Amino acid sequence: MVNVPKTRKTYCSNKCKKHTMHKVSQYKKGKERLSSLGRRRYDMKQKGFGGQTKPVFKKKAKTTKKIVLKLECTKCKKKRFQTMKRCKTFEMGADKKKKGGAVY
């Protein structure tokens, strides 16, 4: 399980050129465009009779995805992405575990 704080002091390579506070959030994939060429080509191919025209991928190998963090500088608002290792569970800004604390 990975717990990441909501703010982090790290280097800003834009105008700041120094370590500043960054707002941390998890990267999410955007909405797919219906007008992109590949999508239009696929939709045209799927039209009419003949069923599924391209193979549907079934040999999934990975059980987890790599976590991608979006870091935004609080001073200049520059955004950058940082990849982390693979993990099953991911938390943002949860309370830190204390040594010798009660386990429920």
UniProtKB/Swiss-Prot annotation:
Component of the large ribosomal subunit. Mature ribosomes consist of a small (40S) and a large (60S) subunit. The 40S subunit contains about 32 different proteins and 1 molecule of RNA (18S). The 60S subunit contains about 42 different proteins and 3 molecules of RNA (28S, 5.8S and 5S). Pfam families: Ribosomal_L44. Belongs to the eukaryotic ribosomal protein eL42 family. GO terms for biological process: translation. It is found in: Cytoplasm. It comes from Plasmodium falciparum (isolate 3D7). One of its GO terms (molecular function) is structural constituent of ribosome. The keyword Kinase does not apply. This is Large ribosomal subunit protein eL42. Keywords: Cytoplasm, Ribonucleoprotein, Ribosomal protein. The keyword Ribosomal protein applies. Component of the ribosome, a large ribonucleoprotein complex responsible for the synthesis of proteins in the cell. The small ribosomal subunit (SSU) binds messenger RNAs (mRNAs) and translates the encoded message by selecting cognate aminoacyl-transfer RNA (tRNA) molecules. The large subunit (LSU) contains the ribosomal catalytic site termed the peptidyl transferase center (PTC), which catalyzes the formation of peptide bonds, thereby polymerizing the amino acids delivered by tRNAs into a polypeptide chain. GO terms for cellular component: cytosolic large ribosomal subunit. InterPro entries: Ribosomal_eL44, Ribosomal_LSU_eL42, Ribosomal_zn-bd. It comes from the Eukaryota.
